[in-house]
Amino acid sequence: MNNTHRYFTTPIYYASGEPHAGHLYSTALMNILERHYQHRGMATRTLTGLDEHGEKIEEKAKSVSKAPQQLVDELALKWKEIFGQFAFSYDIFMRTTSAEHKKNVTQILQRCFDKGDIYFGEHEGHYCVDCEAFLTGKEMDEKNHCLVHKRPTELRREGNYYFRVQKYLPQIIDLICKGEIVSQRRYINELAALAESFEGDLSISRPKTRTQWGIELPFDKNHVAYVWFDALLNYVTGIGGIDAAQTSPLWNSATHVIGRDILKFHGLFWPAILLSLGLKIPRLCVTGWLLSGGHKMSKSLGNVIAPADLLPLGRDAFVNTAFRLANPGEDVDLTIKTITERFNADLANGIGNLASRTLTMIEKYFEGVIPAFHIEQQIEDERLLADQASALPALVETAFDEFRLADALQQTWELIARTDKYIANQKPWELGKHGDDASRARLANVLAHSTAVLRNVGYLVAAFFPERMTELLLALGEDTNQMHNAYNKARDFYDIRKGYKLSVIPRLFQRIEVTSTSAAAALSSPVPSSKASGKTTNAMNTKAPEATPTSSAPTTTTEISIDDFSKVQIRIGTVINAELVEGSTKLLRLRVSLGELGLRQIFSGIREWITPEELVNRKVLIASNLAPRKMKFGVSEGMLLSAEGQNGKVLPVFVNEEMKEGSLLA
């Protein structure tokens, strides 16, 4: 595969209905791959679209009293509309009813026929209309029901044209075992087993007596092309046809993003056709099942997540969870609750909080001017931070080349976590209280290193979150018209825009809040909230929340029994994130880790006496078994214990850093 071009495709989706979350996953993956390789300086092309032929579509059109072309025209508009809502981009939206595609299919059919790779034969077997295929014994149950669609098959006998898969099968098995068709280990084994057990050849036509909705065979006017043969050829149509594909650098660096359920078609039949045509076989990026609540999404289970369920959360929330939880090829378990929690933890509390803290302190202590490094005063933690950040671009490149996108995100978030810990240890808010040159230089170094990490991360995850990372990079003074050079820029850790005056501090990712008990219950269910409650947009918002202080110093003493006291569980917590609450003069919003009890959102009325930066990564005491309290700005899930100091300030009770997170105060 060359280092100048990349051609990425999704499967062309079957035009039998509207998109679901699985379609969004594949399309998002194509977009992420495209942007990543663009940022490495490569020319790219992307293709998605609809597979619009076949008996199933013809039958559906009849059931709604429409012509097949009218039905697919309407669906194509709907698919484009939904893709637009998620800001998905593509160079080609392929439709198999287009004149260009029909011409390409006709030409390829004739070439394969003239070569002797297509012949006429008769077949009797069990046919699944939904699969649009004859099934083998392994693909049916004891009642001859399709294992995928759980419906009875039809016993059919008919004459069709066949493609000689067996002629190319030994060569295909060899390519599979060498990892040249798919490189993901689990799918090498799965595809090899499919190839070694495959018998016979591939039926590539259907008689017009059964269906007329297809591309007519050039050598027999009584047959139309089988929908799968027709559909696979769309990838060549996207290059400009068979002749263009012979010499195209895009075709020679093509990657098909496909679901594991269509592995046989893309990993066995498609290579056979390409070998017949003398074309290079693209590599496959196989995706796993999309689960919800531990089960494969299914209309019968009621756990399908529709685009309408995801829109209120936004594309970034969906993308972060889908590609943070598992690498492509592994199954991904999505619920609205998981998507919300991961967004808040990774984006709002992760890079969003790091950007807010760093840029706010630059504004406060350096009048908004990015400080220069003081390399001569660099400490060991800073050298290690710089080394980790400088090595990250190569690690992310390798991860992408191997379709390990979750690993790429994990390595990036490890850098963010290290930077958060570094800031907590260096306490820049304390350094800012001193006016001496040494403290000033240390403060400059802390903020310069934090800025460099933000710049590095901004370039490396722009493929996932393009709009927000563009905002971040622009805020840092970077030229986002040079994104084709992003990885080279990210390699130079120290190349920050020192002296650049911040014009804006972006709020990159605002937390997604659950604003009602019913919404919280809906989020915890694998069934989408819009299905459970009939309301999606009212269940969540991205705005913040007035309340009273979380605790205050007692003025009188009231005796209670030991039994009463034992009801209160006070635990050690670590403040992971702290931020000002917009619209409140009293509150801080805290994200506190209680170890095995997980993360809690807690509102504390101590904003007057302490800054968010002074709280992060500190060990505190939390009353952990209080009932969740609904406030104006959200739900508070505990109480931060505070007390009044000698100077009148109300401050948290900090505890020894050696105390175990989540442990119960005794």
Regions found by a protein language model. Give the residues of each.
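Secondary-structure transition/capping motifs at alpha-helix termini
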Residues: 1-2, 35-43, 64, 85, ...
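N-terminal catalytic cores of NTP/NDP-binding nucleotidyl/phosphoryl-transfer enzymes
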Residues: 2-75, 94-110, 114, 131, ...
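Structured secondary-structure scaffolds
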Residues: 2-48, 100-104, 155-364, 408-412
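A glycine-rich helix N-cap at a beta->alpha junction
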Residues: 75-89
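Cys/His-rich short segments
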Residues: 115-169
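Helix-rich, typically C-terminal accessory recognition domains appended to large enzymatic cores
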Residues: 120, 325, 339-375, 388-495, ...
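Intrinsic disorder at enzyme termini
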Residues: 472-564
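Phosphate-backbone binding interfaces of nucleic-acid-interacting proteins
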Residues: 535-666
